[in-house]
């Protein structure tokens, strides 16, 4: 399915059904309804040409894959394969798409298979990424972090080294997902792409969002089980939703309140996943923990309704659909079911979510999964270990340890986060 050579964008992009598009906007943490305008043609309008190319590419790639029969089994070559297209775009949608760009889809059959194992339909995947523009959640030193418009997918800018690391573990990762029937706390890797615009390459990884597409996260922790330099900076702490760390977790006497059965299931999954990472000599991963406070969310919802009511009185509404009303996209499944009450979620979409136990001090929902799993214990780590030992002494708790030690310390720390 490799396709290259010049091709006008109009042939792939303009033939699709009516689709809603929205300029990229930065999201507030509150659960405000996002509106998007239904349009006649997929024009991939985003405030950034790179995002437009990404949307065009995913749309093209999924359309191509749909034409190809699903292989009976994946072959070793599928883990090295890629499909690329070079586009010289003269006429179609040139106010949004650059006149020349290239799009590369890495290991398309493997990621298609992973999506299926994670219960994600290809057309829903396509709709979540292209029906409306993704928006930027944050921009850090290691690239941008975007969310699909319906908040079900994370679009992360990665480095070429990450792409190489991903290729190195992909067949092991796939095997692990097959073995555990997709029931994992690891990131759900759903697609990996290269976008080339103006002779510059950008690399993108698409994953399932570990947080909910509808329940706001009020507190967020990145936990590694190390106490050295593991406190959020003052600059971080003043953010609307700061990423807090191990020391903050301990200093706040934070606990996770779930019942014994839930804890047992979670720890079994975590142990299996950590064993897998240790085998591959991977380390420096974190447990991402998001906490949704049910009562606080209800109060915020009431405030939002009052605000909306005032806005509606002052301005006539455009004829738009609100996000979540579309039958397409990963969250579309919810629309055919009964509406969810406060603190309720659909487990097949919010796969990382766990409800607090009945005896918790307050009603909460926790989102917990493993992130940043690609760091290999290599020369770089050994060098960092030497430098830190010199600085802190041989017995100091330091983050850079051997993968076995890292995994053991990590599991011990996570076992103790529960009440």
UniProtKB/Swiss-Prot annotation:
SUPFAM superfamilies: SAICAR synthase-like. One of its GO terms (biological process) is 1-phosphatidyl-1D-myo-inositol 4,5-bisphosphate biosynthetic process. Keywords: ATP-binding, Cytoplasm, Endoplasmic reticulum, Kinase, Lipid metabolism, Nucleotide-binding, Transferase. This is Phosphatidylinositol 5-phosphate 4-kinase type-2 gamma. The keyword Transferase applies. It comes from Xenopus tropicalis. Residues 299-310 have a biased composition (Acidic residues). Phosphorylated, phosphorylation is induced by EGF. Residues 46-418 form the PIPK domain. Phosphatidylinositol 5-phosphate 4-kinase with low enzymatic activity. May be a GTP sensor, has higher GTP-dependent kinase activity than ATP-dependent kinase activity. Its main location: endoplasmic reticulum. It is an enzyme of class 2 (transferase). It catalyses: a 1,2-diacyl-sn-glycero-3-phospho-(1D-myo-inositol-5-phosphate) + ATP = a 1,2-diacyl-sn-glycero-3-phospho-(1D-myo-inositol-4,5-bisphosphate) + ADP + H(+); 1,2-dihexadecanoyl-sn-glycero-3-phospho-(1D-myo-inositol-5-phosphate) + ATP = 1,2-dihexadecanoyl-sn-glycero-3-phospho-(1D-myo-inositol-4,5-bisphosphate) + ADP + H(+); 1,2-dihexadecanoyl-sn-glycero-3-phospho-(1D-myo-inositol-5-phosphate) + GTP = 1,2-dihexadecanoyl-sn-glycero-3-phospho-(1D-myo-inositol-4,5-bisphosphate) + GDP + H(+). It is found in: Endoplasmic reticulum; Cytoplasm.
């Amino acid at each position: 399915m490799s396709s290259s050579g010049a091709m006008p964008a109009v042939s792939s992009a303009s033939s699709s059904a009516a689709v809603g598009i929205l300029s990229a906007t930065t999201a507030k943490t509150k659960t405000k309804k996002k509106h998007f305008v239904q349009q006649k043609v997929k024009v991939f309008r985003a405030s950034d040409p790179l995002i437009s190319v990404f949307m065009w590419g995913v749309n093209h790639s999924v359309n191509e894959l749909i034409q190809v029969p699903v292989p009976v089994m994946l072959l070793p070559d599928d883990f090295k394969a890629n499909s690329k297209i070079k586009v010289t775009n003269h006429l179609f949608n040139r106010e949004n798409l650059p006149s020349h760009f290239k799009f590369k889809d890495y290991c398309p059959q493997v990621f298609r298979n992973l999506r299926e194992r994670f219960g994600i339909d290809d057309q829903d995947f396509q709709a979540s990424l292209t029906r409306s523009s993704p928006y930027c959640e944050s921009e850090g030193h290691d690239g941008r972090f975007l969310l699909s418009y319906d908040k079900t997918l994370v679009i992360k800018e990665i480095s070429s080294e990450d792409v190489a690391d991903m290729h190195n573990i992909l067949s092991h990762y796939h095997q692990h997902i097959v073995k555990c029937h997709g029931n994992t706390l690891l990131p759900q890797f759903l697609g990996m792409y290269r976008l080339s615009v103006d002779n510059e390459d950008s690399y993108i990884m698409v994953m399932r969002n570990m947080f909910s597409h509808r329940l706001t996260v009020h507190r967020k922790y990145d936990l590694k089980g190390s106490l050295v330099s593991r406190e959020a900076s003052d600059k971080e702490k003043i953010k609307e939703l700061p990423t807090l760390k191990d020391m903050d977790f301990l200093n706040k006497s934070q606990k996770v309140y779930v019942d014994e059965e839930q804890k047992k299931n979670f720890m079994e999954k975590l142990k299996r996943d950590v064993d897998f990472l240790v085998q591959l000599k991977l380390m420096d991963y974190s447990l991402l923990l998001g906490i949704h406070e049910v009562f606080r969310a209800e109060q915020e919802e009431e405030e939002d309704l009052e605000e909306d009511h005032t806005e509606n009185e002052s301005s006539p509404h455009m004829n738009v659909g609100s996000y979540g009303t579309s039958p397409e996209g990963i969250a579309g499944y919810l629309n055919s079911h009964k509406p969810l009450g406060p603190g309720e979620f659909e487990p097949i979409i919010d796969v990382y979510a766990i409800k607090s136990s009945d005896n918790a001090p307050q009603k909460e929902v926790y989102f917990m999964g493993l992130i940043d799993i690609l760091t290999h214990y290599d020369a770089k780590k050994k060098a960092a270990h030497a430098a830190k030992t010199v600085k802190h002494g041989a017995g100091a708790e330091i983050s850079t340890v051997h993968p076995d030690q890292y995994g053991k310390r990590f599991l011990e720390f996570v076992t103790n986060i529960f009440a």
